[in-house]
Amino acid sequence: NLSDFVFSLIRAIGLILLLRAVGVMNFAQGDLLAIGAYALYFITVMHDIQGPIAIVLLLLFFVAFGAFFMMTTYWPVRKTKWEQALLVVTIGASTVIKELEMLICGSQPQTIEPIVRGSIQMGRFVLQYQYLFVFAIAGVLMVAVYVLFDKLYAGRAMSAAAQNKYAAELIGIPTKLTTLSTYAIVATICGVCGALCAPLFMVRTSLATFQMKSFAGIVLGGFGNIKGAIVGSL
């Protein structure tokens, strides 16, 4: 249950980041998580690339895919007067991503070795190091997002661009760059979460459905509120 809470929190952080920096809800967010699991499987199992090289390739892929996702979903409809356009586009993107995952890696769930092997025993309880690793990553991400939006100029610039792009451009904020950076960061967060999930829940397209808990968490905790998301994810 604790690990489920941590994974929900990591996914909620990605949603909050996109809401606060771009002002949109991404219904393909869960599929970005599944992409992280499939990317880990593709690199480490199908091509047998391990260690630091695999980590670098994964991070580069997540950043590049985030930029690609922004240019193909958000950017073409950013000026439309139909407010639901982006929601419809992300739902369509979700379907496309699922089909591509099955086309490239197959439709059967795949197993993958834990990123951090081993376990620690405490009485009758056995805790895998993979779970401890997940807890540590979740803590780092939570602090990083909080610092970004509450302490750094870059985060405030992202929030300003989300609230009023025209006014943000007038004071010199590069709105295209802030939006691109946001999508790259969100894709990386979701991809890392998916890679962490893969050894524990298998590599499968249904990982995308995990995002529903995160939607519920941010609704209960208040849109864009990290502290509220922590409570809501519980």
Predicted ranges, named:
Residues 15-37, 51, 80-85, 154-157, ...:
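Short, non-helical or kinked segments that cap or interrupt transmembrane helices
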Residues 20-25, 64-108, 151, 208, ...:
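Short loop segments and helix-boundary regions at transmembrane helix junctions
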Residues 21-68, 72:
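Membrane-embedded helix boundary and interhelical linker motif in transport proteins
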Residues 1-11, 39, 48-54, 80-87, ...:
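Membrane-interfacial amphipathic/re-entrant helices at transmembrane-helix boundaries
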Residues 126-206, 226-232:
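Helix-loop-helix "hairpin" substructures at the membrane interface of multi-pass membrane proteins
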